[in-house]
Every structure is written in C-alpha cells, then in structure tokens.
C-alpha cells in the first residue's frame, strides 16, 4: 500500500493467465474472458493508491487509462463524450439511469483495480460508443486483514469567472474553501465454518468509507449608482460603479457514505460471489439571483447495487451467470425550512416587499422617496429572473434496473466457441412539485401568473375545468437485450483470430424502438515473443449507442403544466418530440491497430491507433426527434487517435508510466453532452436553426495530450520515504463562434474554426513516509494552483444575424443584421465560463493490520 513495501527482484516470466500482470501483454489462453484485440488498461488499486489521489473514487481516475481524455461529464474515449461509456461493477451494469454517466462511486480502497477499455471490442463485450470501465472489487484473503485509512483535505475557494463589461446582477454568488475528512476501513478474510460445511473456501470483504465536508457560499448584493444624475449608470461604457447593499452567507454540511459487503465461496470449479455495494450522500446547490431562502435546494441520494455471480471454470469450459439490481434515488428538498411550504416568485424585477430580505427590497425600491438614483433603476433584472419566496421546483427521481447475463465458452480443438446474452430493464420514475403547490411568475409590477401541474384534461378556456395537481408523476422505461455468437481460432499458441456477431435490442418507451441492431466484430492478435509477453493486433467492431432512461423526457412525456393569470390560461400538455418515421439507431464502426511488449517485468510499451465513424446521430429538430440532416449534411462524428505509452518498474526503486497521444474528432454531431449546454439528452440546440456551419472539430477533439506518472522510493533518517507525481497537459477544446437569434443558436462560422481554448496543465504531488507500520502521506492536487479557463463564452452576438457560410474569424467585423446595421459584439464574448479547480491539499494516514 502506498508503494512503500519492498519490491521483489525480477523473476522468470510465467504463464500470463488472464493477462493482467505487469509482465504480460495478453492472456495466453484464448479461453480467458478478456478481449486481446484492443487497447485495455489494467489499473490496480495498489498502483492508484500510490499516486496523489487523496480520497478519490473510481470515476475520478478512470481517465488515467491510455487513450482516455476528460470532459465535463467524465472520462472520454475515442471522440465520444463522458456520458457514452459503459460502467460496470464486476461485470454488472452500474451506469446512471438518467444520463448514462457513472452512478455508484467506489472508493479506491474498495477496489482490486479498474479494467478500462478505450476501444477494440469482440462480440462478448457489452459496449456503447465510448469506453468501458469495469470496477473489480476486493475479494477475501487467506488471513484476516484490516486496512485503515484517513484523510483530511482542504480545497481552496474557486476563482469566480470574470464578468462582462457593463453587465450587472443583483446578487453574485461565490463559493468558499471546502474542508473535508474521510475515513476508510476495509476488512477481508476467510469464513471458516461455512466453507468447511460446503466443502470449499468461503471468504468475505467489507468496507465503509464515510466523508464529511462543508462548503461556505456567500452572496454580494449591490445596486447601480448615478452620482452625476445624467440618467446613465456610472461607469458605462466600462465596468459599472456599484454600491454594496449587503452580504449574506450560508454553509453546507455534506456527507457521503460508501459501503461494501461481499461474501464468496470457491468450491472446485465453482465460484459464487454475492455483493452489496452502495452510497448514501447529501449535497446542496444554490441560485445566485435570489433571496437566501429561495436560493437553496438540498439533494439526498442513495445509490447501490446487489450482484450475484456464479462462475464455472473447467479446463475446456468457462461459464458465468450473473443477476444484478441497480437502484438510485435522488430526493430534493428546500435548503431553508421556511421556503418549503410557500410558492416561489420568479420576477423580472426585485419586489418592493421581501419578507425574507427587507434590506434588499428597500435598497432596490425605485419608487422610494429615499431613492438616491431616481433616473436609473437601482437593481434591474436584465436576464433571467429574480427568485424569492419558496424554493420552487423540486424533483424526486427513483430508478431501478434489474439485469441478468449468461456466458458460455467451450474449447473445441483449436477453437473456442462463445455464446451468451444479457437483458436489462430500466424503470425511472420522477415526481415533480412546486413548494406551496405553485410557482408564480411576474414580468411587471401588478402582473402575476401562477404555474401549476395538472393531470387529466386542461384547456386554455377559463370556462372549462383544469385538473390541477400538487405534483406530476412520470415513468420512463427502457429495455436492452443482447445475444452473441463468437469463435476464436488459435492455429498456434501465439496467434488467435476472432470473429463474432452480436445482436442488440434497444427500446425507449413505446415509440423509439430498435430491434435489429446487428454488430459484426473481428479481431486478430499475434504474440511474436511468446508467453503472452507481446502482441500485435488489429480489430474491427460495430457498436450501437446505449440510450439512457432520461431520454424519456425527449421522446415519451414531459410534465404537464398550465399558467393562469386570472384573465387567461395557457396550458402545456408536456408532449414529447415526435419520433421520425424510419429513424435509425446511432451506429459506430471502429478499426484499431496496435502493438504491445512487456519485458522481464520491468518494461511495457504500447503503440496504438484508432479510427471511429459514428453515423445516424440522434437529435431533435423542429418538433421531431430523429436522424437530422438532409442527406448532404448528416449527423456524423469521425475520430482518429494515435497513442504511445511506456511503463518502467523495479529500476533502482523507481517506477515511471508515461503516455502521449494525438487525436482528431470532426463532424456535425456532438453527442449527448456539450460543454456549453451540459447533458442535453439529445435535445440540444445545434440542429434547431439548420445545419449551416455545423461541420468541424467537435468539443471532444482532443488535440495533443501527454502525462507522466512517477514514483521514487528511498530512505531518509531511518524512515522509508517515497515521492510520487502525476503531470498532465492537454490541448484546449476547439472554439466556435455562435449567435443567439430568434430562431435559436446558430453557428456564425464553421464549427471549431476560431482556434482552441488555452492549454490545460496540472501537476499533482505526493510525499509519504512510513514509521513503525504507519504510513503518512501529503497529497497536493494542482500543485501550482493553475486557474486556466476550461471553457469560454462562444456567443458573439444576440441579434438578427445569419451564419457566414465558410467564413473565417476575420469576417466577423463585417457581420450585419437583417436590418442592415452592424452586429453588436457581446462584451461577454470569449470570457471564461469555467476555470480549472483550485489547489487542494490532503493529509492522510494508513495502517495495515
């Protein structure tokens, strides 16, 4: 643990078995479950825990695998976004039911390791259009062992992005530093009596790793001034001069409690494992432009998996049957108890009466006799709305996904024949409600509209009834099924040729149903050095996108609401987008080529190339959900990646792992996540106003990336000490130029043609020492406290403008509106919207019993 144990001398190369050992490049037996026809990285927990990771969970370090990058949604592979991966726990699906991102977060102390595949699939593999991440949990040990860890961590306050010249907000929100403390206790060992009775070896593994954290948030309220009385706010056309009104603050108390309980029985060729793993957590989120009671919403989540697995391993036969149940629940409540039972008011002004903030109301009252700036509004709400009263919309989400999987592999001479199948059914239920039973909206003083949910019937005719309801309940269901047949032919111990066909079914509700997804997959690998110490491989594979249940709000149903202002009524039945006739599933074709060599347990080198083409992207257009494009411009994504890595161990107490990659991703379809829009559930804005200028480098175009991980062991003053570091640098994302028009967001210039955002670099450092069996560590994340922009505001103008087809950045100075005047550039254009996370320091201790 933590890399302070003495390293044994290099030994002779043994059979590579499953191919996971450092001195192995591939499994030596074609009967093994792992696919050798692509780029897979085995990240042992014993290795990850030697790096500066503090109390990280597995979803935070999956991007350490070769071929991986990272976007705002998670680790990204092969040009895909961070919500296109498949996440599994010991082979059982554990993706988030709503979006497809990681759901059950597993502490590294619970893991045996992470098996990450960046590309290259065989018919047996459950895959989508991204990567696959399998978290392999700790098993029992021959003797009773207890591993105890504790960390205390402080993350500095993040820097607020700069505000645009001339912009104003009534209240601005800032986040303070975040102290947190984590403890982890993991016990493993044998279970004597049951194992003896059943004639085998029984074992257990159990762990708990609670984290307690607190974060301070503060609001600064200010008003405009007009000291010279000229009717123009002071400071314009530059930064506004503001007069402070008040500062308010709150502090959250957040927690996370992951827990694991496992038992297993090994009896001859039979292996049975029963697993319960999950997490209970609490967190808060806040609005900026709101009174304190109306600003906060608390989230209480519970996520977990129950997994039962039987494996049979005979000399010529491997079999597996696995049943699993994934559950998640997210309950929202008002952060302030006083905001739980009253309606929220969203207004285009600051009300003159605010029971929860009378000081702000008085300072912003333009009708007050004490108003010091009578010719300008004190507190204009220029964009969005000001929230007061209750907490507003609260949504509870509960999801369940039972699944069953079966696999059989049989050796027949030089062939290994595999057959198998899987079935997953997801139910996602949402319950939405407004505090106080309604949400009030006002565009002007004296005008008020009440928004409520309804069930049954409703019309815009006030004389007709409308069945108002206190809450709206919706249920979304998805079904995924697959079956495969695969043949691996090994004409010699060093060569294996694989061919297979996978059939998949993907249904989302009653209208979006793909039942004939056929995926041929081919692969060949050659071990020129023998013994599993090398491999050359090539593969071709087709995959189809896994569609999450959250897509139901796009294609099944949304909440039904109506607005009533006393004189008129407007209802929204919550109709989803119509699924286009003849819609095709998202299909991806992939080719990989690579070489890997592992020598004497001290050196491993990998060279890898990957090409992917996504066709039939799914997205919303005007009132319809389908495959956008008119035939000439279709929704596609094309990726090419080349990567190289080198790992060295046991060389003068030094371990080094380094990698470099270059990638290109172009097309018209960004996928279900976009840095500007977030997770959009395939109803983004790209295709709403046409396809002009959509083709170009996509946000997942990774450019150049490099990383170095290193560890050095030694002795200092009688102590075993070590220094470990991880350095990473990568190109910024491609930059586009957009416009906000009455038709929606349009691309003024070809996508990604305005250069790239700044390079992102980060250095992490760990110092550790061991004394009398106790290991102390100091981790520094983002050592140099770099705060470079991660994303910029790409909206150039908010005006009636049209795309400059095939234009360049220099053409923007000539941009005009439909009315013939020059377009006005927004002062927020190219200002940072997100910065790198700040420096974080963690002190840890570890003890093995």
What are these regions (language model features)?
Residues 2-139, 169, 184-192:
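Periplasmic N-terminal accessory/gating domains of Gram-negative outer-membrane beta-barrel systems
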């Amino acid at each position: 643990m933590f890399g302070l144990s003495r390293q044994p001398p290099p030994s002779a190369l043994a059979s590579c078995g499953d191919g996971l050992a450092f001195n192995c490049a591939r499994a030596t037996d074609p009967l093994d479950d792992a696919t050798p026809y692509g780029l897979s990285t085995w990240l042992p927990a014993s290795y990850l825990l030697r790096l500066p990771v503090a109390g990280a969970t597995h979803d935070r370090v999956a991007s350490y695998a070769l071929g991986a990058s990272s976007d705002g949604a998670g680790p990204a592979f092969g040009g895909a976004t961070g919500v296109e991966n498949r996440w599994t726990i010991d082979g059982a699906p554990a993706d988030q039911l709503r979006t497809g991102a990681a759901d059950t977060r597993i502490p590294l102390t619970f893991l045996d390791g992470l098996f990450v595949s960046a590309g290259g699939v065989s018919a047996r593999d459950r895959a989508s259009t991204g990567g696959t991440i399998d978290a392999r949990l700790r098993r029992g040990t021959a003797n009773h062992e207890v591993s105890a860890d504790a960390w205390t961590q402080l993350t500095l306050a993040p820097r607020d992005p700069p505000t645009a010249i001339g912009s104003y907000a009534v209240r601005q929100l800032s986040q303070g530093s975040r102290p947190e403390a984590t403890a982890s206790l993991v016990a493993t060992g044998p279970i004597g009596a049951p194992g003896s009775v059943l004639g085998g070896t029984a074992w257990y593994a159990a762990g708990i790793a609670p984290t307690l954290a607190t974060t301070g948030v503060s609001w600064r309220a200010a008003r405009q001034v007009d000291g010279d009385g000229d009717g123009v706010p002071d400071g314009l056309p530059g930064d506004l001069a503001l007069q402070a009104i008040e500062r308010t603050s709150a502090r959250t108390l957040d927690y996370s409690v992951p827990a694991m309980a496992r038992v297993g029985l090994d009896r001859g060729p039979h292996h049975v494992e029963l697993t319960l793993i999950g997490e209970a957590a609490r967190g808060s989120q806040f609005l900026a432009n709101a009174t304190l009671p109306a600003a906060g919403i608390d989230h209480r989540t519970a996520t977990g998996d129950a997994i039962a697995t039987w494996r049979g391993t005979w000399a010529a036969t491997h079999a597996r049957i696995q049943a699993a149940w994934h559950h998640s629940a997210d309950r929202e409540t008002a952060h302030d108890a006083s905001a739980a039972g009253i309606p929220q008011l969203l207004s285009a002004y600051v009300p003159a009466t605010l029971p929860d903030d009378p000081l702000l109301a008085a300072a912003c009252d333009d009708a007050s006799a004490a108003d010091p700036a009578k010719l300008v509004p004190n507190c204009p709400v220029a964009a969005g709305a000001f929230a007061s009263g209750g907490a507003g919309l609260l949504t509870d989400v509960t999801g369940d996904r039972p699944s069953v999987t079966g696999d059989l592999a049989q050796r027949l001479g030089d062939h290994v024949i595999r057959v198998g199948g899987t079935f997953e059914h997801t139910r996602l239920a949402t319950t939405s409600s407004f505090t106080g039973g309604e949400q009030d909206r006002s565009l002007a003083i004296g005008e008020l509209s009440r928004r409520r949910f309804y069930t049954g019937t409703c019309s815009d005719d006030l004389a007709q009834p409308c069945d108002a309801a206190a809450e709206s309940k919706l249920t979304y269901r998805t079904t995924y099924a697959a079956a495969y047949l695969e043949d691996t032919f090994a004409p010699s111990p060093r060569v294996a040729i694989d061919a297979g066909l996978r059939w998949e079914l993907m249904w989302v509700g009653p209208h979006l149903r793909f039942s004939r997804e056929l995926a041929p997959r081919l692969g060949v690998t050659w071990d020129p050095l023998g013994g599993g110490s090398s491999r050359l491989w090539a593969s071709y594979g087709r995959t189809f996108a896994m569609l999450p249940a959250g897509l139901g709000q796009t294609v099944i149903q949304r909440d039904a609401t109506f607005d009533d202002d006393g004189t008129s009524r407007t209802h929204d039945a919550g109709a989803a987008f119509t699924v286009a006739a003849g819609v095709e599933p998202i299909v991806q074709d992939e080719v990989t080529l690579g070489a890997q060599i592992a020598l004497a347990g001290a050196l491993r080198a990998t060279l890898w190339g990957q090409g992917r083409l996504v066709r039939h992207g799914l997205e919303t257009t005007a009132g319809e959900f389908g495959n956008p494009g008119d035939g000439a411009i279709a929704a596609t994504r094309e990726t090419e990646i080349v990567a190289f890595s080198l790992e060295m161990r046991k060389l003068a107490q030094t371990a080094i792992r380094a990698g470099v990659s270059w990638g290109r991703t172009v097309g018209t379809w960004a996928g279900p996540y976009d840095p500007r829009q977030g997770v959009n559930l395939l109803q983004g804005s790209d295709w709403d106003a046409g396809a002009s200028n959509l083709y170009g480098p996509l946000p997942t175009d990774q450019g150049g990336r490099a990383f170095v991980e290193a560890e050095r062991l030694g002795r200092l003053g009688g102590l075993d000490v070590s220094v470990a570091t991880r350095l990473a640098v990568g190109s910024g994302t491609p930059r586009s130029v957009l416009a906000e028009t009455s038709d929606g967001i349009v691309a003024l210039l070809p996508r990604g043609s305005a250069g790239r955002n700044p390079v992102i670099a980060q250095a992490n450092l760990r110092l550790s020492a061991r004394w009398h069996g106790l290991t102390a560590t100091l981790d520094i994340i983002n050592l140099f406290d770099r705060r470079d922009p991660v994303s910029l505001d790409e909206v150039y103008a908010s005006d009636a403008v049209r795309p400059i087809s095939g234009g360049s950045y220099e053409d923007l100075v000539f941009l005009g509106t439909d009315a013939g005047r020059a377009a006005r550039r927004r002062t927020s254009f190219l200002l940072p919207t997100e910065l790198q996370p700040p420096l974080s320091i963690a002190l840890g201790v570890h003890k093995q019993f």
